[in-house]
Amino acid sequence: MTLFGGVEAGGTKFVCIIASKPDDIRAETRFPTTTPAETLGRVIDFFQRNSRRYPISALGISCFGPVDLDTSSPTYGYITTTPKPGWAQTDILHRLSDALKTPAILDTDVNGAALGEYRWGAGQGADPCLYLTIGTGIGGGGIVNGKPIHGLVHPEMGHMRLPHDWQADPFPGWCPYHGDCFEGLA
């Protein structure tokens, strides 16, 4: 049976899994998101410790962002200008793929969740399928014609600017890039 590795790279925690399908989980772990070196080291350690018993044929990574998903970009696979301290310009895709010597693919955390709901959860039969999340951040992912939305049409919902009455509420927002976007005011 073919086994796959999965990484949910979240702003507060990482979850790693080895499975053949959603209801056949062979190994799983979770740990807090700290520094890139420590956190990615724990990811690599989990898969290497389990590689003899549960060898994976590929790795899927859903990651907080923003992430560069343009395969022609020199920073493809990187977490880019994230407000998460210490994580900006982290090459998560190649660091994990190279260390584990396995093919890997990366998408946004919300697209990963949207795809999971579309294939196995509440989004089955819905196309397009939209997934909204409020957690460490605010975001959304979308599936159209069975594929995640990328590029200029990707819905960075957490960073949409909101109408803001500066007289009633002078708070400028905490987002270092947009100030009073949805996430910056939450």
Model-derived segments and their meaning:
Residues 4-8, 56-60, 105, 129-133:
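Short glycine-aspartate micro-motif
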Residues 22-55, 73:
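N-terminal phosphate-binding loop and adjacent alpha-helix
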